[in-house]
């Protein structure tokens, strides 16, 4: 995949919007954790919401850092983290659903949870691999 070059204004807008996402995520996290602690299974709910928040914030933090950095070697590495963190964000989003809603559904919850997280880990790792042009594997 070709590296898209953003102009200065686009980079500034990306940095600002993702930085705002971090702040809003922290605020929302407080309310989500508060609500989770009132759940019938508070330990499960708080753990699942924490995983969700970690995935979401990893995505916003890595993206903010990537878009806010100057061109160079560091930016190239941060781009890989930015792309890899999307997989963690997706898996974190599935976690509350699979372990709070589906956990007692005859193995479906744990099965989907394992599949999603193994896929996310594979995607994260592939984000750091240099693939041949026109490879069937891309992140």
Where does each model-flagged region fall?
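Multi-pass alpha-helical transmembrane bundles in non-GPCR membrane proteins
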Residues: 1-139
